[in-house]
Amino acid sequence: MSDLENIDYYDYKALLKRARSQIPDYVFQKDRFELPEIEILIEGNRTIIRNFRELAKAVNRDEEFFAKYLLKETGSAGNLEGGRLILQRRISPELLKSRINDFLREYVICRECGKPDTKIIKEGRVHLLKCMACGAIRPIRMI
């Protein structure tokens, strides 16, 4: 309580300074979130994302969840095999990159602060995206 006794309750700047001092430093950092370069290989009628496991780790999401999203959005059958995602049709690299960016916007990046430090939690029957940086919570649709 001694910290609160020293504050003039009408001094907005002092209160603001105190509140800001209690927020972790990493919240104020402006580091850009960069995804590793996507390694796409087209073999016949199959498209392979060679570094899929690395991509999933970079965005801190389960490989199965990420793969399910890409398979649904590209309208393709496919499977995970040894850290690679194999899609059973030819898909342009531009389309894949676009769908991966859509995934990041919907399931990774916080809409409030723009940071990728989020996790998916479940409360009852609702899935939520919770930001670990700013504390924002928003509902998301599951795949």
UniProtKB/Swiss-Prot annotation:
InterPro entries: IF2/IF5, TIF2_bsu_arc, Transl_init_fac_IF2/IF5_dom, Transl_init_fac_IF2/IF5_N, Transl_init_fac_IF2/IF5_Zn-bd. Belongs to the eIF-2-beta/eIF-5 family. eIF-2 functions in the early steps of protein synthesis by forming a ternary complex with GTP and initiator tRNA. This is Translation initiation factor 2 subunit beta. GO terms for molecular function: translation initiation factor activity. It comes from Methanocaldococcus jannaschii (strain ATCC 43067 / DSM 2661 / JAL-1 / JCM 10045 / NBRC 100440) (Methanococcus jannaschii). Heterotrimer composed of an alpha, a beta and a gamma chain. Disulfide bonds: none annotated. Pfam families: eIF-5_eIF-2B. HAMAP family: eIF_2_beta. Gene3D superfamilies: 3.30.30.170. Keywords: Initiation factor, Protein biosynthesis.
